[in-house]
Design a protein with these regions (language model features):
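Acidic-and-aromatic substrate-binding clefts and catalytic sites of carbohydrate-active enzymes
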Residues: 58-66, 90-95, 203-209, 234-237
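Flexible, glycine-rich active-site loops centered on histidine and acidic residues
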Residues: 5-33, 92-153, 157, 201-215, ...
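Hydrophobic faces of well-ordered beta-strands that scaffold small-molecule active sites
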Residues: 10-16, 55-57, 82-87, 112-116, ...
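N-terminal beta1-alpha1-beta2 module of alpha/beta enzyme domains
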Residues: 1-78, 154, 172-175
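Conserved, mostly hydrophobic/aromatic
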Residues: 47, 51, 74, 104, ...
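Acidic (Asp/Glu)-rich catalytic clusters
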Residues: 6, 45-49, 71-80, 101-112, ...
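Short, conserved secondary-structure transition motifs
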Residues: 229-243
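Active-site mouth loops of central-metabolism enzymes
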Residues: 22-38, 86-95, 170-182, 233-236
Length: 248
């Protein structure tokens, strides 16, 4: 993934298993690896020591730890690596979220990125298309307020006339917004307001098609996207050992 903030052409990231998603065997939960402060903190610190550029702090309502609390707690331990903080926008009021983003970015010295999740409010359910439309409104509100601009927004989901919070990010702008989703509504949302479009493992031809499609959608809006790719990696001393482990 191309990184605008640093001089490296590619950002190499890891993730901390806040959603009880640290498995020895993919998709098979292990009670010994459930999320806890100690376990997830150690993942973050090991990733930083190993030279990773960024680390995802995922978020889910039912599983694991609260991502906002964990991000604030781990931030003082992180002195080089960026945090990719997952935010469930269906659970947040955008002006208050803008203030939290600015505060956490300050604590991190400007090393914050935000993974936008188009979530429901727990206990409620919204159809996919309006949920993504609400997410687009939220992303645009965040970008306006975190750029220090007065917000005058009248949308389907938010009707706001408000000044930005006094707390500013280190850059005076909104941190990069990462966003993933393959449905047409999700792709439109990413093209409209995200900065980095996240993808999942697939064949090279299919990934190439997705990238071309997303570039075209963004270009229609006079925008450009960067791209991220998530993959599960099995590392051993030799390729034969890695393949043998993968076949278990």
């Amino acid at each position: 993934m191309t990184d605008d903030i640093g001089n490296r052409p590619c950002e190499i990231s890891w993730f901390s298993a806040l959603c009880d998603d640290d498995y020895e065997f993919l998709g098979q939960p292990d009670p010994m690896l459930q999320s806890s402060w100690e376990h997830c903190r150690n993942i973050v610190l090991t990733a930083q020591k190993g030279g990773f550029d960024n680390i995802l702090l995922p978020s889910g309502y039912q599983l694991g730890m609260d991502t906002t609390i964990f991000a604030a707690a781990i931030a003082p331990y992180v002195d080089r690596m960026r945090l990719l903080w997952a935010v469930r926008v269906g659970e947040d009021w955008p002006p208050q979220l803008a203030r939290r983003i600015a505060t956490l970015d300050r604590i991190l010295g400007g090393r914050l990125a935000v993974n936008i999740i188009s979530s429901d409010l727990p206990g409620q359910s919204l159809e996919s298309e309006p949920r993504y439309a609400r997410t687009v409104e939220a992303m645009k509100i965040l970008k306006t307020m975190l750029s220090g601009e007065h917000l005058s927004h009248k949308g389907e989901f938010y009707d706001l006339e408000i000044d930005p919070p006094r707390m500013k990010t280190m850059s005076g702008k909104c941190p990069p917004l990462y966003f993933g989703g393959l449905s047409p509504a999700a792709r439109e949302a990413a093209a409209e307001a995200a900065d980095v479009y996240l993808m999942w493992p697939d064949t090279m031809d299919k990934v190439r098609d997705v990238v071309a499609d997303m570039r075209a959608r963004a270009a229609k809006r006079g925008r450009k996207l960067k791209f991220g790719y998530r993959a599960h990696v099995i590392v051993r001393e030799t390729e034969d050992e890695a393949r043998a482990y993968a076949a278990r």
